[in-house]
Amino acid sequence: MFSRIYFTTPLVSNKSQNTNTLRLVPGYLMNMHSINMRAIWPLVSLFSAVHALPAASATASASVAASSSPAPTASATGNPFEGYQLYVNPYYKSQVESSAIPSLSASSLVAQASAAADVPSFYWLDTADKVPTMGEYLDDIQTQNAAGANPPIAGIFVVYDLPDRDCAALASNGEYAISDGGVEKYKAYIDSIREQVETYSDVQTILIIEPDSLANLVTNLDVAKCANAQSAYLECTNYALEQLNLPNVAMYLDAGHAGWLGWPANIGPAAELYASVYKNASSPAAVRGLATNVANFNAWSIDTCPSYTSGNDVCDEKSYINAFAPELSSAGCDAHFITDTGRNGKQPTGQSAWGDWCNVKDTGFGAQPTTDTGDELADAFVWVKPGGESDGTSDTSSSRYDAHCGYSDALQPAPEAGT
Protein backbone atom coordinates (compact mmCIF):
# COMPACT_ATOMS: atom_id res chain seq x y z
CA MET A 1 0.00 0.00 0.00
CA PHE A 2 0.92 3.61 -0.19
CA SER A 3 1.24 4.95 3.29
CA ARG A 4 2.24 8.50 2.57
CA ILE A 5 2.99 10.14 -0.71
CA TYR A 6 4.57 13.43 -1.53
CA PHE A 7 4.58 14.60 -5.10
CA THR A 8 7.86 15.74 -6.51
CA THR A 9 9.17 16.68 -9.88
CA PRO A 10 9.93 13.36 -11.47
CA LEU A 11 8.48 10.01 -11.93
CA VAL A 12 10.46 6.85 -12.14
CA SER A 13 10.86 3.64 -14.00
CA ASN A 14 13.37 1.18 -15.37
CA LYS A 15 15.57 1.97 -18.33
CA SER A 16 14.84 4.66 -20.80
CA GLN A 17 11.61 6.25 -21.77
CA ASN A 18 9.79 8.24 -24.27
CA THR A 19 8.29 11.36 -25.48
CA ASN A 20 6.05 14.29 -25.09
CA THR A 21 2.31 14.42 -25.49
CA LEU A 22 0.56 14.59 -22.14
CA ARG A 23 2.77 15.60 -19.40
CA LEU A 24 1.72 15.21 -15.94
CA VAL A 25 5.06 15.49 -14.38
CA PRO A 26 4.98 12.73 -11.92
CA GLY A 27 7.38 12.42 -9.23
CA TYR A 28 7.19 9.51 -7.00
CA LEU A 29 3.80 8.18 -6.39
CA MET A 30 5.04 5.18 -4.53
CA ASN A 31 3.17 1.95 -4.77
CA MET A 32 3.50 -0.26 -1.73
CA HIS A 33 2.88 -3.84 -2.81
CA SER A 34 3.60 -5.31 0.58
CA ILE A 35 0.83 -5.83 3.08
CA ASN A 36 2.54 -3.79 5.74
CA MET A 37 2.07 -0.05 5.67
CA ARG A 38 5.38 1.77 5.38
CA ALA A 39 6.13 5.43 5.27
CA ILE A 40 6.78 6.41 1.69
CA TRP A 41 9.79 8.42 0.80
CA PRO A 42 9.08 12.04 0.01
CA LEU A 43 8.12 12.80 -3.54
CA VAL A 44 8.57 16.09 -5.20
CA SER A 45 5.82 17.61 -7.19
CA LEU A 46 4.48 14.66 -9.09
CA PHE A 47 1.90 16.90 -10.61
CA SER A 48 3.48 20.32 -10.37
CA ALA A 49 4.75 22.23 -13.38
CA VAL A 50 2.98 19.96 -15.79
CA HIS A 51 0.41 20.07 -18.50
CA ALA A 52 -2.92 18.69 -17.37
CA LEU A 53 -3.91 15.27 -18.55
CA PRO A 54 -6.82 15.11 -20.95
CA ALA A 55 -10.00 14.30 -19.10
CA ALA A 56 -10.12 10.72 -17.95
CA SER A 57 -13.17 8.64 -17.23
CA ALA A 58 -14.18 8.40 -13.62
CA THR A 59 -15.52 4.91 -14.18
CA ALA A 60 -13.63 1.70 -13.66
CA SER A 61 -12.25 1.80 -17.17
CA ALA A 62 -11.06 4.35 -19.67
CA SER A 63 -11.55 4.12 -23.40
CA VAL A 64 -8.75 3.11 -25.72
CA ALA A 65 -10.74 2.69 -28.88
CA ALA A 66 -14.45 3.21 -29.20
CA SER A 67 -15.68 0.94 -31.95
CA SER A 68 -17.80 -2.20 -32.13
CA SER A 69 -18.05 -4.86 -29.45
CA PRO A 70 -16.09 -7.81 -30.85
CA ALA A 71 -15.89 -11.23 -29.32
CA PRO A 72 -12.52 -11.86 -27.68
CA THR A 73 -10.56 -13.56 -30.45
CA ALA A 74 -7.00 -12.43 -29.88
CA SER A 75 -4.63 -13.54 -32.59
CA ALA A 76 -1.56 -12.41 -34.44
CA THR A 77 -3.75 -11.10 -37.25
CA GLY A 78 -5.56 -8.26 -35.50
CA ASN A 79 -4.95 -5.44 -33.07
CA PRO A 80 -6.27 -6.78 -29.73
CA PHE A 81 -6.81 -3.24 -28.41
CA GLU A 82 -9.21 -2.20 -31.17
CA GLY A 83 -12.80 -2.08 -30.00
CA TYR A 84 -11.98 -2.30 -26.31
CA GLN A 85 -11.51 -0.01 -23.38
CA LEU A 86 -8.81 -0.91 -20.87
CA TYR A 87 -9.43 -1.73 -17.24
CA VAL A 88 -8.36 0.84 -14.69
CA ASN A 89 -6.00 -0.80 -12.18
CA PRO A 90 -8.05 -0.75 -8.93
CA TYR A 91 -4.99 -1.17 -6.75
CA TYR A 92 -3.17 1.78 -8.25
CA LYS A 93 -6.31 3.90 -8.22
CA SER A 94 -6.98 3.14 -4.56
CA GLN A 95 -3.44 4.02 -3.53
CA VAL A 96 -3.52 7.33 -5.38
CA GLU A 97 -6.85 8.18 -3.78
CA SER A 98 -6.04 7.03 -0.26
CA SER A 99 -2.42 8.11 0.05
CA ALA A 100 -1.41 10.50 -2.69
CA ILE A 101 -4.39 12.81 -2.88
CA PRO A 102 -4.69 13.45 0.88
CA SER A 103 -1.11 14.73 0.86
CA LEU A 104 -1.88 17.37 -1.77
CA SER A 105 -3.07 20.83 -0.83
CA ALA A 106 -3.53 22.52 -4.20
CA SER A 107 -6.87 21.74 -5.83
CA SER A 108 -5.23 21.69 -9.26
CA LEU A 109 -2.88 18.92 -8.14
CA VAL A 110 -5.76 16.96 -6.64
CA ALA A 111 -7.57 17.14 -9.97
CA GLN A 112 -4.49 15.98 -11.85
CA ALA A 113 -3.87 13.13 -9.43
CA SER A 114 -7.50 12.05 -9.75
CA ALA A 115 -7.17 12.08 -13.53
CA ALA A 116 -4.00 9.98 -13.39
CA ALA A 117 -5.69 7.46 -11.10
CA ASP A 118 -8.33 6.87 -13.77
CA VAL A 119 -5.85 6.15 -16.56
CA PRO A 120 -5.66 2.39 -17.20
CA SER A 121 -2.37 0.77 -16.22
CA PHE A 122 -1.17 -2.81 -16.22
CA TYR A 123 -1.36 -4.87 -13.04
CA TRP A 124 1.95 -6.65 -12.39
CA LEU A 125 1.78 -10.32 -11.45
CA ASP A 126 5.23 -10.11 -9.87
CA THR A 127 4.55 -12.75 -7.21
CA ALA A 128 2.35 -15.81 -7.30
CA ASP A 129 0.10 -14.42 -4.58
CA LYS A 130 -1.02 -11.66 -6.97
CA VAL A 131 -2.72 -14.15 -9.30
CA PRO A 132 -5.94 -14.43 -7.25
CA THR A 133 -6.24 -10.64 -7.50
CA MET A 134 -6.06 -11.02 -11.26
CA GLY A 135 -9.09 -13.29 -10.94
CA GLU A 136 -10.94 -10.64 -8.93
CA TYR A 137 -10.24 -8.06 -11.61
CA LEU A 138 -11.32 -10.37 -14.42
CA ASP A 139 -14.52 -11.11 -12.51
CA ASP A 140 -15.19 -7.38 -12.19
CA ILE A 141 -14.55 -6.90 -15.91
CA GLN A 142 -16.91 -9.76 -16.75
CA THR A 143 -19.61 -8.20 -14.57
CA GLN A 144 -19.22 -4.78 -16.16
CA ASN A 145 -19.23 -6.23 -19.65
CA ALA A 146 -22.38 -8.24 -18.88
CA ALA A 147 -23.98 -5.02 -17.66
CA GLY A 148 -23.38 -3.45 -21.06
CA ALA A 149 -19.96 -1.80 -20.93
CA ASN A 150 -19.51 -0.28 -24.37
CA PRO A 151 -16.95 -0.70 -25.68
CA PRO A 152 -16.29 -3.87 -23.70
CA ILE A 153 -13.44 -3.85 -21.21
CA ALA A 154 -10.17 -5.77 -21.62
CA GLY A 155 -7.91 -6.82 -18.76
CA ILE A 156 -4.21 -5.87 -18.88
CA PHE A 157 -1.50 -7.67 -16.90
CA VAL A 158 2.27 -8.17 -16.75
CA VAL A 159 3.60 -11.71 -16.28
CA TYR A 160 6.77 -11.19 -14.25
CA ASP A 161 8.02 -13.95 -11.97
CA LEU A 162 10.85 -15.85 -13.67
CA PRO A 163 13.25 -17.76 -11.44
CA ASP A 164 16.46 -15.74 -10.92
CA ARG A 165 14.57 -12.75 -12.27
CA ASP A 166 16.40 -9.52 -13.13
CA CYS A 167 19.62 -11.42 -13.72
CA ALA A 168 21.72 -8.39 -14.71
CA ALA A 169 20.69 -6.20 -11.78
CA LEU A 170 19.64 -6.52 -8.17
CA ALA A 171 16.72 -4.17 -7.65
CA SER A 172 13.90 -6.46 -8.86
CA ASN A 173 15.07 -9.91 -7.85
CA GLY A 174 12.06 -12.20 -7.53
CA GLU A 175 10.73 -14.93 -5.28
CA TYR A 176 11.98 -18.00 -7.18
CA ALA A 177 15.51 -19.38 -7.43
CA ILE A 178 16.56 -21.81 -10.13
CA SER A 179 18.58 -23.69 -7.53
CA ASP A 180 15.45 -24.22 -5.42
CA GLY A 181 13.02 -25.68 -7.92
CA GLY A 182 12.30 -22.31 -9.47
CA VAL A 183 11.45 -23.63 -12.93
CA GLU A 184 8.74 -25.94 -11.64
CA LYS A 185 7.42 -23.25 -9.31
CA TYR A 186 7.24 -20.87 -12.25
CA LYS A 187 5.29 -23.39 -14.29
CA ALA A 188 2.80 -23.69 -11.43
CA TYR A 189 2.53 -19.90 -11.42
CA ILE A 190 1.76 -19.92 -15.16
CA ASP A 191 -0.76 -22.71 -14.64
CA SER A 192 -2.55 -20.54 -12.08
CA ILE A 193 -2.70 -17.64 -14.54
CA ARG A 194 -4.06 -19.94 -17.22
CA GLU A 195 -6.74 -21.12 -14.81
CA GLN A 196 -7.89 -17.55 -14.23
CA VAL A 197 -7.91 -16.73 -17.93
CA GLU A 198 -9.88 -19.87 -18.77
CA THR A 199 -12.37 -19.19 -15.99
CA TYR A 200 -13.10 -15.82 -17.60
CA SER A 201 -12.86 -16.98 -21.19
CA ASP A 202 -15.24 -14.26 -22.36
CA VAL A 203 -12.90 -11.48 -21.18
CA GLN A 204 -10.24 -10.15 -23.53
CA THR A 205 -6.94 -10.42 -21.66
CA ILE A 206 -3.73 -8.73 -22.82
CA LEU A 207 -0.44 -9.89 -21.32
CA ILE A 208 3.10 -8.56 -21.41
CA ILE A 209 5.53 -11.42 -20.92
CA GLU A 210 8.56 -11.10 -18.62
CA PRO A 211 10.12 -7.63 -18.85
CA ASP A 212 13.90 -7.58 -19.38
CA SER A 213 14.32 -11.36 -19.55
CA LEU A 214 15.00 -12.06 -23.23
CA ALA A 215 16.78 -8.73 -23.67
CA ASN A 216 19.21 -9.83 -20.98
CA LEU A 217 19.91 -12.97 -22.99
CA VAL A 218 20.89 -10.80 -25.95
CA THR A 219 23.34 -8.48 -24.21
CA ASN A 220 24.19 -9.77 -20.73
CA LEU A 221 25.37 -13.34 -21.04
CA ASP A 222 28.73 -12.15 -19.75
CA VAL A 223 26.96 -11.73 -16.40
CA ALA A 224 27.25 -15.06 -14.61
CA LYS A 225 23.71 -15.00 -13.25
CA CYS A 226 22.30 -14.41 -16.75
CA ALA A 227 24.44 -17.12 -18.31
CA ASN A 228 23.34 -19.54 -15.62
CA ALA A 229 19.70 -18.55 -16.08
CA GLN A 230 19.64 -18.75 -19.88
CA SER A 231 18.20 -22.23 -20.25
CA ALA A 232 15.67 -21.68 -17.46
CA TYR A 233 14.52 -18.38 -18.96
CA LEU A 234 14.00 -20.02 -22.34
CA GLU A 235 12.22 -23.05 -20.90
CA CYS A 236 9.95 -20.91 -18.74
CA THR A 237 9.15 -18.43 -21.50
CA ASN A 238 8.33 -21.28 -23.86
CA TYR A 239 6.01 -22.76 -21.24
CA ALA A 240 4.27 -19.43 -20.70
CA LEU A 241 3.70 -18.87 -24.42
CA GLU A 242 2.34 -22.37 -24.95
CA GLN A 243 0.09 -22.44 -21.89
CA LEU A 244 -1.31 -18.95 -22.33
CA ASN A 245 -2.02 -19.38 -26.03
CA LEU A 246 -5.76 -19.09 -25.50
CA PRO A 247 -8.54 -17.63 -27.69
CA ASN A 248 -9.17 -14.66 -25.39
CA VAL A 249 -5.49 -13.80 -24.89
CA ALA A 250 -3.08 -11.49 -26.70
CA MET A 251 0.58 -11.60 -25.69
CA TYR A 252 3.49 -9.24 -26.22
CA LEU A 253 7.00 -10.37 -25.35
CA ASP A 254 9.02 -7.66 -23.68
CA ALA A 255 11.76 -6.38 -26.01
CA GLY A 256 13.72 -3.82 -24.02
CA HIS A 257 13.96 -0.41 -25.65
CA ALA A 258 15.90 1.64 -28.18
CA GLY A 259 18.81 2.23 -25.84
CA TRP A 260 19.16 -1.46 -25.13
CA LEU A 261 18.51 -3.54 -28.24
CA GLY A 262 18.36 -0.70 -30.76
CA TRP A 263 22.12 -0.58 -31.31
CA PRO A 264 23.40 -1.99 -34.64
CA ALA A 265 25.34 -4.72 -32.85
CA ASN A 266 22.30 -5.84 -30.85
CA ILE A 267 19.27 -5.58 -33.10
CA GLY A 268 20.12 -8.49 -35.42
CA PRO A 269 20.94 -10.97 -32.64
CA ALA A 270 17.82 -9.79 -30.80
CA ALA A 271 15.65 -10.55 -33.81
CA GLU A 272 17.13 -14.02 -34.09
CA LEU A 273 16.48 -14.75 -30.42
CA TYR A 274 12.90 -13.48 -30.40
CA ALA A 275 12.08 -15.33 -33.60
CA SER A 276 13.52 -18.56 -32.21
CA VAL A 277 11.52 -18.21 -28.99
CA TYR A 278 8.36 -17.62 -31.00
CA LYS A 279 8.96 -20.57 -33.32
CA ASN A 280 10.06 -22.92 -30.53
CA ALA A 281 6.69 -22.31 -28.88
CA SER A 282 5.03 -23.43 -32.15
CA SER A 283 4.31 -19.87 -33.30
CA PRO A 284 1.38 -19.33 -30.92
CA ALA A 285 -1.52 -17.40 -32.46
CA ALA A 286 -2.00 -15.34 -29.31
CA VAL A 287 1.47 -13.78 -29.61
CA ARG A 288 0.82 -10.49 -31.33
CA GLY A 289 4.30 -9.06 -31.02
CA LEU A 290 6.59 -7.17 -28.68
CA ALA A 291 6.33 -4.57 -25.93
CA THR A 292 8.94 -1.81 -25.79
CA ASN A 293 10.02 0.83 -23.32
CA VAL A 294 8.42 -1.02 -20.41
CA ALA A 295 9.23 0.90 -17.21
CA ASN A 296 11.51 3.17 -19.19
CA PHE A 297 11.74 6.74 -20.35
CA ASN A 298 12.51 6.95 -24.08
CA ALA A 299 10.55 9.28 -26.32
CA TRP A 300 8.15 7.72 -28.80
CA SER A 301 9.39 10.16 -31.43
CA ILE A 302 11.85 12.97 -30.91
CA ASP A 303 13.36 15.46 -33.35
CA THR A 304 16.79 15.73 -31.76
CA CYS A 305 18.43 12.80 -30.02
CA PRO A 306 19.39 13.67 -26.43
CA SER A 307 23.12 13.82 -25.73
CA TYR A 308 22.93 10.79 -23.44
CA THR A 309 21.88 8.55 -26.34
CA SER A 310 25.54 8.43 -27.33
CA GLY A 311 25.19 8.96 -31.05
CA ASN A 312 22.77 6.14 -31.78
CA ASP A 313 20.40 7.28 -34.55
CA VAL A 314 17.82 4.85 -33.18
CA CYS A 315 17.16 7.03 -30.16
CA ASP A 316 13.38 6.80 -29.80
CA GLU A 317 10.87 3.96 -29.76
CA LYS A 318 9.33 4.73 -33.14
CA SER A 319 12.74 4.45 -34.78
CA TYR A 320 13.43 1.31 -32.78
CA ILE A 321 10.33 -0.63 -33.80
CA ASN A 322 10.71 0.41 -37.43
CA ALA A 323 14.31 -0.83 -37.41
CA PHE A 324 13.44 -3.98 -35.48
CA ALA A 325 10.37 -5.13 -37.44
CA PRO A 326 12.21 -5.92 -40.72
CA GLU A 327 14.89 -7.84 -38.82
CA LEU A 328 12.22 -9.87 -37.05
CA SER A 329 10.39 -10.54 -40.29
CA SER A 330 13.58 -11.75 -41.95
CA ALA A 331 14.09 -14.11 -39.02
CA GLY A 332 10.58 -15.51 -39.42
CA CYS A 333 8.61 -13.51 -36.86
CA ASP A 334 6.27 -10.77 -38.05
CA ALA A 335 5.45 -8.53 -35.11
CA HIS A 336 3.42 -5.56 -34.02
CA PHE A 337 4.32 -3.50 -30.99
CA ILE A 338 3.02 -1.70 -27.96
CA THR A 339 5.04 1.02 -26.24
CA ASP A 340 4.95 2.07 -22.60
CA THR A 341 4.35 5.82 -22.46
CA GLY A 342 3.61 5.87 -18.75
CA ARG A 343 6.70 7.86 -17.81
CA ASN A 344 8.09 9.38 -20.97
CA GLY A 345 6.28 12.69 -20.96
CA LYS A 346 9.28 14.96 -20.39
CA GLN A 347 12.11 14.98 -22.89
CA PRO A 348 14.99 14.97 -22.51
CA THR A 349 15.00 13.30 -19.13
CA GLY A 350 17.49 13.91 -16.34
CA GLN A 351 19.56 10.86 -17.30
CA SER A 352 23.31 11.32 -17.26
CA ALA A 353 23.74 8.16 -19.34
CA TRP A 354 21.27 6.16 -21.39
CA GLY A 355 21.87 3.10 -19.27
CA ASP A 356 20.78 4.89 -16.10
CA TRP A 357 17.43 3.29 -15.40
CA CYS A 358 16.72 3.72 -11.71
CA ASN A 359 14.32 6.39 -10.41
CA VAL A 360 15.45 8.88 -13.03
CA LYS A 361 14.99 12.57 -12.31
CA ASP A 362 13.09 14.97 -14.58
CA THR A 363 10.58 12.56 -16.06
CA GLY A 364 6.80 12.75 -16.44
CA PHE A 365 3.64 10.92 -17.45
CA GLY A 366 3.37 10.47 -21.21
CA ALA A 367 0.53 9.93 -23.66
CA GLN A 368 -2.52 8.19 -22.28
CA PRO A 369 -3.38 4.74 -23.66
CA THR A 370 -4.60 4.90 -27.24
CA THR A 371 -4.57 2.97 -30.50
CA ASP A 372 -4.05 6.24 -32.37
CA THR A 373 -0.29 5.83 -32.66
CA GLY A 374 0.27 7.08 -36.20
CA ASP A 375 2.33 4.00 -37.04
CA GLU A 376 0.91 0.79 -38.46
CA LEU A 377 3.46 -1.26 -36.52
CA ALA A 378 2.34 0.20 -33.19
CA ASP A 379 -0.89 -1.29 -31.89
CA ALA A 380 -1.13 1.01 -28.89
CA PHE A 381 0.51 3.31 -26.41
CA VAL A 382 -0.05 1.92 -22.92
CA TRP A 383 0.86 2.64 -19.32
CA VAL A 384 2.69 -0.46 -18.14
CA LYS A 385 4.66 0.88 -15.19
CA PRO A 386 2.29 2.82 -12.92
CA GLY A 387 3.54 6.35 -12.39
CA GLY A 388 5.48 6.77 -9.20
CA GLU A 389 6.49 3.21 -8.43
CA SER A 390 10.09 2.88 -7.38
CA ASP A 391 12.61 1.13 -9.60
CA GLY A 392 14.77 0.16 -6.66
CA THR A 393 15.92 1.12 -3.22
CA SER A 394 18.68 3.63 -2.51
CA ASP A 395 19.38 1.91 0.81
CA THR A 396 22.90 0.51 0.42
CA SER A 397 22.30 -2.00 3.22
CA SER A 398 19.47 -3.71 1.34
CA SER A 399 20.08 -7.05 -0.37
CA ARG A 400 18.29 -5.61 -3.41
CA TYR A 401 20.35 -2.43 -3.60
CA ASP A 402 21.66 -1.75 -7.10
CA ALA A 403 24.33 0.89 -7.61
CA HIS A 404 22.25 2.57 -10.34
CA CYS A 405 19.78 3.62 -7.64
CA GLY A 406 22.53 5.61 -5.95
CA TYR A 407 23.59 7.57 -9.02
CA SER A 408 23.32 11.36 -9.03
CA ASP A 409 20.51 11.28 -11.60
CA ALA A 410 18.38 8.97 -9.43
CA LEU A 411 15.81 10.27 -6.97
CA GLN A 412 16.83 9.56 -3.40
CA PRO A 413 15.93 8.32 -0.88
CA ALA A 414 13.90 5.60 -2.59
CA PRO A 415 12.15 2.44 -1.35
CA GLU A 416 12.27 -1.10 -2.74
CA ALA A 417 11.31 -1.70 -6.36
CA GLY A 418 7.60 -1.92 -6.95
CA THR A 419 6.70 0.15 -3.90
Model-derived segments and spans:
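Substrate-binding cleft of extracellular glycoside hydrolase catalytic domains
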Residues: 142-254, 269-276, 284-286
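Structural recognition of the beta-strand scaffold that forms the well-ordered cores
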Residues: 85-87, 123-125, 154-159, 204-210, ...
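Fungal extracellular Ser/Thr-rich, low-complexity intrinsically disordered regions
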Residues: 52-77
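Surface-exposed substrate-engagement region within the catalytic domains
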Residues: 101-111, 247, 261-406
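Stable alpha-helical elements in mature extracytoplasmic
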Residues: 134-137, 189, 193, 233-236, ...
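Fungal secretory targeting signals
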Residues: 1-6, 10, 21-58
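Surface-exposed cleft-lining segments at the edges of enzyme active sites
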Residues: 120, 125-126, 180, 217-229, ...
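N-terminal carbohydrate-binding/catalytic regions of secreted carbohydrate-active enzymes
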Residues: 80-199, 386-402, 406-409
